[in-house]
């Protein structure tokens, strides 16, 4: 918990995304949810990923490739997704290494369901 959070805020995991993962906090914006979901990939928390996935697009199960290490997130653009919005998009780059190394760029769409931000869909470049 004392290590720097993978989402890139500069805070420790315990001060940052762990609070979302533990249920102590709920993401106030689409970008905050994106950061917490990236960190969930980085720490292997598939349950959080499923819990924050839009019920209309959520898979029944999610298998994470533990051979991939997600180590850096760059937020490129955010549209909407604020506390008073109902939808938003976040364009980001996720850097990874492992059996293969590279960067995945994605435009993700988020919406609020019962007042909470959820991930709906993503277009991978």
UniProtKB/Swiss-Prot annotation:
<dbReference type="InterPro" id="IPR004027">
    <property type="entry name" value="SEC_C_motif"/>
</dbReference>
<comment type="similarity">
    <text>Belongs to the UPF0225 family.</text>
</comment>
<dbReference type="InterPro" id="IPR032710">
    <property type="entry name" value="NTF2-like_dom_sf"/>
</dbReference>
<dbReference type="Pfam" id="PF02810">
    <property type="entry name" value="SEC-C"/>
</dbReference>
<dbReference type="InterPro" id="IPR023006">
    <property type="entry name" value="UPF0225"/>
</dbReference>
<dbReference type="Pfam" id="PF17775">
    <property type="entry name" value="YchJ_M-like"/>
</dbReference>
<dbReference type="InterPro" id="IPR048469">
    <property type="entry name" value="YchJ-like_M"/>
</dbReference>
<protein>
    <recommendedName>
        <fullName>UPF0225 protein Cgl1438/cg1626</fullName>
    </recommendedName>
</protein>
